[in-house]
Structure formats: structure tokens, C-alpha cells
A protein has these predicted regions:
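Short functional micro-motifs and their immediate structural scaffolds
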Residues: 285
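Conserved Rossmann-fold dehydrogenase catalytic segment
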Residues: 183-196, 226-227, 233
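Short cysteine-rich clusters marking metal-coordination/redox-active sites
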Residues: 277-280
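Residues immediately within or flanking Cys/His clusters that coordinate Zn2+
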Residues: 274, 289, 296
Length: 321
């Protein structure tokens, strides 16, 4: 009798194990199905994302979208340089770039980051502009962050289209490249996506992911990145920041871009009566952007802003430099 009871117990145990295995298999299948429902396959096929790097680019303009778009499973996100090797951002941080524009013939998404003087100078680089046009001819999306819109605009593709850029650079984008500038965090005009300054590139990156993979996938990425910005103050753009602060920053940008936007070569043979800019102290051998005649003498200045500062009280600078 005991042998019979033991045999029955063994049979029941085996049956129980088989039942649990079946339940587990069913559970796993159900879990996979739920994941498939929650994160459906991509609506748009994106296999390659190239982030352009050049000396003087703004760090977060490139690294923000690089990190965000790097969350696209099955997508190769990489840097593309004007040349291979080390590329320095605007603050001198160097990044090794293993792929040059000469080697890349197609990208599903191109990201063009912004910067400052170097970015504007690249709007005249025909080699780069022709490469962007070639990539754009077959890309799914062609995008820019911050003043990278200047470079994209220089190809002609933003002429007559809605776009945005860094708040200070909007006038250049409109006047030089014909864009219909919008006061938005990011703007989509067909296949072209442009973002406002620096941090806005991450928002644009999330919007691109939403377009490619949908809401649930985007929310999962936001959770993975713990993307929940909470700045200490409201502000960050020219329309929601104190006017005095905006004007001070605008003046700084104006001075910094003076030589690039208004290059003057006719001053090279002029003998100046000052060796340094009276207002800021910068040596004139680095370049002269403006001049003034005062008390029979000719003074040079590194920017119009410095000249204007001098002219408010020129007598106070007597004997300086």
C-alpha cells in the first residue's frame, strides 16, 4: 500500500512540474506579447544617424541628440567629422572621430550642431555644403541644433520654410538664409527639423524618437534618461528672460561675431594711434573691425560695441595704451 501511495505521489509531482512549465511558457509568451503591444515595431526605418562634428561646435548641441537618439534600438549613431582624428568643441574638449564626410554617402538622419564664429564660417564651406546636399537627397530626416541651422540654411533647403535656431541667431537665419523663423523649442518642416539653442536639441531628439517609435517608446526613453527638467528659474529664451539680461547677452554676442559678420580688410594699411583697443584692451594686431577719428588721431577697435563704448566718454581714455 505504501508503495502504491509513493508511486501516486511521484506521478502527481511530475504532473505538477509539467503544469508549472506549461504555465511558465504561457506566461513568457504573454509577457512578450504585452511588450510587442506596448512597444510596436518602428513606424519609420532608421538604421544610421550621423552627428556632424567640427572644431568649435557647441558640446551639448551634438552630445544631447547623440545620447537621446542612441536609445533607438538597432540604429547606428556615430560622429562624422570634416576630417578624421581629434575634433575640439568650443571649449577645447577633444573627441576622437573615426569617420569623415568623405566616407559617408548616406544617412537616415543627419544632425548638424551649432557653435559660434566657426559655425558661421562653415556657411561658406562649399565642400561641407555639397556633402550635406548629397546626404539630404536620400535622408529620412535632415536636422540641426542651435546655430547649426545656419549651416543647413546655407544649403538653401530652409529658404521659405519654417525653422528655428538659437535666440540670438534668428535674424541671421531669416536675413541670410530666408527661413520663416518661429519662436518654438523645435520646428518640423517636412523632413527638416530645427531646434532652438543647445538644450533644445534633446527635446527635438525625443520628438524624432516619437515620430519613429511612438509614444510608449519615447516615454520609456525619457524614463531611462530620467529626463525631467526642473530649472531653478523660469527663463532660458529672449521672450521669458529679464530685458536687461537679454540686452547684456545680446551685446556680448554682437561683439563676439562682429569680425565674422563684418570683416574689414581695408584697415590693414592704416597706421593707428593706439596699439590696443581703448575699451577692452585687446591688441589691435588680432584684428580691427571699426575705427574712429578723434582729436586728429585715428583709433582702431576690435568691434563696433567697443567703439561705441569709447565714444560715450572718449576723454576718459586719454593716455591709455
Amino acid at each position: 500500500m505504501k508503495k502504491i501511495m509513493l508511486l501516486v505521489a511521484v506521478v502527481l509531482a511530475i504532473a505538477s512540474c509539467k503544469s508549472k512549465k506549461k504555465e511558465l511558457a504561457t506566461s513568457i509568451k504573454s509577457h512578450d506579447e504585452k511588450l510587442a503591444e506596448m512597444f510596436p515595431t518602428a513606424k519609420i526605418d532608421v538604421k544610421t544617424v550621423g552627428v556632424l562634428l567640427y572644431d568649435g561646435y557647441s558640446t551639448l548641441d551634438a552630445m544631447g541628440p547623440y545620447n537621446v537618439l542612441g536609445e533607438l534600438m538597432g540604429t547606428n549613431v556615430f560622429f562624422v567629422g570634416l576630417h578624421k582624428g581629434l575634433v575640439a568643441d568650443v571649449k577645447g574638449m577633444k573627441v576622437q572621430v573615426d569617420t569623415s564626410i568623405a566616407e559617408v554617402k548616406h544617412l537616415d538622419i543627419l544632425v548638424i550642431p551649432g557653435g559660434f564664429k566657426e559655425t558661421y564660417e562653415l556657411t561658406k564651406d562649399t565642400t561641407l555644403l555639397n556633402w550635406i546636399k548629397m546626404i539630404d537627397s536620400s535622408s529620412v530626416f535632415t536636422t540641426s541644433v542651435c546655430t547649426g541651422a545656419w549651416i543647413l540654411g546655407a544649403t538653401g533647403v530652409l529658404n521659405g520654410k519654417e525653422a528655428t535656431t538659437h535666440w540670438w541667431g534668428k535674424k541671421i537665419l531669416a536675413d541670410d538664409f530666408g527661413a520663416k523663423v518661429q519662436q518654438k523649442r523645435y520646428v518640423r518642416s517636412g523632413k527638416y527639423w530645427t531646434s532652438a539653442g543647445i538644450t533644445a536639441g534633446m527635446d527635438m531628439g525625443l520628438a524624432l524618437i516619437n515620430e519613429i517609435r511612438g509614444e510608449n517608446y519615447t516615454r520609456a526613453i525619457m524614463l531611462d534618461l530620467e529626463y525631467d527638467p526642473q530649472p531653478i528659474y523660469k527663463g532660458g529664451s529672449d521672450y521669458n528672460t529679464d530685458t536687461a539680461i537679454v540686452n547684456a547677452m545680446r551685446s556680448m554676442y554682437d561683439m563676439g561675431m562682429e569680425k565674422v559678420l563684418h570683416p574689414v580688410t581695408s584697415y590693414q594699411n592704416i597706421k593707428f594711434d593706439n596699439a590696443k583697443d581703448f575699451f577692452c584692451g585687446m591688441p589691435l594686431n588680432t584684428g580691427v573691425a571699426d575705427t574712429v577719428h578723434y582729436n586728429g588721431k585715428v583709433y582702431g577697435f576690435c568691434s563696433k560695441g567697443c567703439k561705441d563704448g569709447f565714444m560715450k566718454d572718449p576723454a576718459s581714455y586719454g593716455g591709455r595704451y
